[in-house]
Amino acid sequence: GSEMCIRDSGNIMRYIPPVPYEEEVWFYEELDENVYLIKMIPGIKPRILRSVFENYDCIIVESFGVGGIPQSIADDFYKLCQEFPDRLVVMSTQVAHEGSDMTVYEVGHDMKKYCRFLESYDMTLESVIAKVMWMLGNREALGGNLEDIFYQNVNYDVIFGKNRKC
């Protein structure tokens, strides 16, 4: 079979093998729009956090670099994660080619102590938003664990994921 690849300046970045359809195609029509995207910037204030946690089912955190929460909001963020354990928190990054890696900085280690979160790895922010809205809106129909569903490859939205191997 033929293989596709993504090229960058003539260099092959990734092979994308063709995958035959193995099951019947299902269509899902529900989306959970109670998803909030918060972009981390240096000096961000914690004032908005309580309202976000109170009003949204999922908080997607777009950090700078490969992952982290600015110190200015870290304590408040961790407390809210513990106060609202049913909220889905997804850590994303603006450097999708590098992917998120919450083990790089101390704040990532702290987050793992205080918060239950999913990590976007090499997923684009658009893929994360669409997937979370789909997952939460169709939770019953999809069955299973949200973490397993999130990390399941859907149309190559996550290629490297947890194993980070090319």
Question: For each predicted feature, which ranges?
Answer:
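Accessory alpha-helical/coil subdomains and C-terminal extensions
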Residues: S2-G68, N155-C166
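ATP/nucleoside-binding phosphotransfer catalytic cores, i.e., glycine-rich phosphate-binding loops
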Residues: Q71-C166
